[in-house]
Amino acid sequence: MPAMTIGMRRMCAAALAALTMAGALAATAAPQPPALALVPWPAQVAPEGAGLRLESGAVIAVPTGDAEAEKIATALAARVLRDRGLRLIVRSGGAGAIVFKRASDGPPDAYRLEILPTGATLSASGDAGLFYAGVSLWQLCTANATRGPVALPGLRIADAPRFAWRGLMLDVARHFSPVVDVKALIEEMAQHKLNVLHLHLSDDQGWRLEIKRYPDLTRVGAWRTPPGGQPAQYGGFYTQAQMRDLIAYAAERHITVVPELDMPGHAQAAVAAYPQFGVDIAGDGAPRAGRNRRPAVSVDWGVNPYLFNVDDRSLRFLEDVLDEVVSVFPSTFIHVGGDEALKDQWKASPAVQRRMQSLGLRSEDALQSWFIDRIGEYLASKGRRLIGWDEILEGGLPPDASVMSWRGTDGALAAARMGHDVVLAPAGSLYFDGRQSERDDEPEGRLGQLPIKRVYDFEPVAPELDAAHARHVMGLEGALWTEYVPSRQLMEHALFPRVAALAEVAWSTRDARNWEAFLPRLVLAQQRYRRQGIAAADSAFAVQVDVVGGRAAALAAGKAQVRLSNQVGFGEIRYTLDGSTPTSGSSTLPASGLLELPLPARLRANAFAQDGTPLAAPRTQSIDVANLLTRSSNALNACPDGELGLRMPLRPEASDWTPVFNVNLMDSCWIYPAARLDGIGEIVVDAARLARNYGLAHDAVKVVQHPAASPDGELEVHLGSCTGTLLASLRLPAGSATQTLALRAPLPASTGVQDLCLRFTADIHGPLHAIDAVRLVPAPQGKTQPLPLPASSLR
C-alpha cells in the first residue's frame, strides 16, 4: 500500500471530485437501493436493470501478464468459494463472466464496478482499486446464506475512499493476540476496506516485539504474573519473522501495519527488562529504576509512573530499538505514544533536573517536547514520520510530526491549524472497549456506553476547520484497548458490528451516509458475520424489556406493564409467554407498544427483519416477585458524587466470559434504587473480591475508606441514603481476591419505597469488593421485626 501522504489525500479528494462530475451515474445523495449488501456505501451507485447470474466454473479474466491483478482475482475467487461455495476460475487474458481491467488514469484506490447481463467488469488504475472492487463484488456475492450460484443485481458503481487513513488500533500489550487472531482481524478489516492496522506493541503490562539487540525486552518484558498467580505467567510476543509475515499478509490486503512503542511514559515493562534505561531517582547513576529496585512488569491497568530516562545512554537505547523497528515495518509512520506520561520520576531525579538545566528547559512538559523532537528527528533521518497521541502537543511539536487525537477533537483541531497532519480517534466516539449497550448481558469493559449510532454519526472534519486546514485530516481510527478484552471472542464482540459503522464513516462521503439506509445493510452484514463465525455483538438489535412505572409499582399491583424495544428501533418485535422460542409468526406488540402481564410471567422476545430473519438471539425475562425484588450489578446506581466507571471480571486473565461487576474504583458504594420494603425480612447479597489492579496515579488519594468495625470489614446497608439508618452490617470473612461471597442478613421491618445504600468498609489497600446482585427476600407471615434494631444484633 502506498505511504500516507498529503499527495495521497489530494488523490482521494480528486477521485471523489471526478466521480461527482460523472453525470451518467447517480448522485451520491440519491436514495440507496434496498438491501444491497455493501458496507461501506460507495460514492456512486446506479441501478442497471437486469443483472448477472454466476454459475460454478465461471471465469474471472485478468489482463495478460498482470501478476498483481491475477493475485487479487485469485483471492476474490477464494473468498467467494469460502463464503458462497461457488467455484470461480481465474484465467489470464480472454473473455470471462468477470473481467478485471486496468484503467488508464485515476487514483490508485478508486475503482469502477459494472454488473450487466453480459458480465461484471472491475476496473482501476491501481492494485488497491482492483482489490476494493473485488471486495464490493464479494459482498454482493455473499449477501445471503444460499450456497452455489448467485444472481447479482445489475448496477454501476464508481467509488473511491474519502480518507486515506481508515484505521483500527489493537492493543496487544495489555492482552496479547496470537498471530492467528491478528490475521483473522486483518482479513475482517480488508472486508470493510479499512487500510491501517495500528498495533500498540508496548505498555506497562508488556513488550510484544522481539528486539534482537535487547533480548530481555521480550524474555522479561513480555511476561507478567497476574493478581492471584493464575496463571503463573501470562504474556507473549512476536518474533521479527512473525511480524514480517503479518505485515506481508496485511499488505496483500492493502493494509499498512503501523507500530506503536510508547515513550517516554507507559515504560514499565521496558524498565523491568532494562532498569538502567529508567529514571535514576537516587541520583547516583546506579543501574536501577524507581526507588532502588527493578520493577516487575505491571499487572495494574491505568496509569503507572515509569518513564524512560533522558540521558544519552537511554536515548541511544531507544534509537537502537527504533533501528530494528524500521527494519521490520515499512510504514511511513511510526507511532511513539507520548500519552499519560506522569512526570513524577523526572521531577524527583537530580540527574534529570540537571539535564533540563543544561538544555535550558523550564518544565517537564518542555522536556517531553524535547524528547519527542529528538525521537522525531531520528525517525526523519530514517525516512520515517513520527505520530503520537495528542499529549505530544504539550510543549510544541516537531515540524513533521502528526497527531492522533484521543482526548476529544480539540487536539486534532489545534494540530491541523498548526499545519500538522492529524488522525481522529476520540475516546467518546471511537474507543471500542466501551460497552455496546447498557444491557445486563454485556461483558467486561468500560461502562461508558458507545452505541453503534454514535460511531456512525461521528464526523472527522469539524465544521470550524477551513478548507486549507481540513486537508490535514488524514482520517480516523477506532481503538480497542484490551485491559478487559482477553480473548478473540471478546475482541470480536467489542469490534463488530461497530467496525461496519467506522468503515462507512472512513470511506463514504458525508452526504452519502444515511443511518436509516445503513440499518438494512447492517442486518445483512450481521448475518454474514454469523456465517463466518465472527462473534459480533447483537446488542443493537436485541430486545430490551423495561418495566414501565418501576418495579415497586408492579409489586404493589401484582402485575407489570412492560415495554419491548431495541437500541436501534429496527425490526418487528415478536414474543411468547409459554417459554417457546419466538419466531416471525409469534405474537406482535399491541399498538401502544406495551404489554400488561399478570405476575408471574416468563417473557421471551426477539426482533425480526421483513423476511422473517431473526436479528439477534432471543432474550428471556422472568417477571415475578423474586425478579422484581432483585437488582443485578448493572441495575444498581452509583452513590452520590460517585461514578460506576468499570465493568470488571472476577478473574483478570480469564480468557472466556466470566462473571462481571460494575464498580467505582474510588468508592465501593452502590444504591439499590426504589426498594419496596413492605414485608421484606432478609437481604441476600452475592458479592466478590476482585483484584485491585488499576493504577490511579495521583487520584489514588481520593479513594474513600469507610470506617470498619472488624478486621476484614463489613457490608453496610443503610436506609434512604448512605447517612440513613443502619439496617444491617454483614461481616466479611477473611480471604483474598478472585473470590465470590454469599452474604445474608435479616432486615428489620420497614414500609414504603426507599433507596438502600450498600457500602463496603474493607481496607482499601486490599482486594476491591464488588456486588453481583442484591435480593430482597419477603419474610414469612408474621416474622418481620420492627425498626429500629441495634446494629450489633444484625451482624
Q: Which sequence ranges carry the predicted segments?
A:
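Contiguous, structured surface segment used for ligand recognition
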Residues: 30-165, 490, 502, 506-532
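Feature activates predominantly on carbohydrate-active enzymes
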Residues: 106-333, 374, 378, 477-480
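Active-site neighborhood of glycoside hydrolase catalytic domains
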Residues: 296-400, 406-414, 418
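Extracytoplasmic
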Residues: 618-795
